[in-house]
């Protein structure tokens, strides 16, 4: 979302970029059901903060913490701390969002940087502190299955939805979309 929001607007800004982002996230149908027409502000809110979206970033952190509490004894201290810290920080972002309304680009950038760091923190703590037993390998398998699924969705959206018919493959818009 952070890079997509910074794409040059010389291409007409039809909103297809955000529609394709919702589609790649598997959230387009739910978005249309709850919100309707696709626009940047609503798409960002739906993907990041909307509690009606079960796959929003905030809901994912909430569910991760709930699940971690259920299996607390199977987690290392570092793993628990990383999940709990992410949950507490997310609550701070939600409280600030409730006071100010729609999130501005600077705060969105901070939020997405925080999410990236929290994800890397958990992944690093899991990789470095877990015993190499079935639980470790099962969690790694889950990571790779999710990666493969997301990669397949992105490739599908990129070549079937995003690039306008008038734009050449390998052109400037194609370049900006791939780097976003």
Where are these regions (language model features)?
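Alpha-helical transmembrane segments and their helix-helix packing motifs
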Residues: 1-180
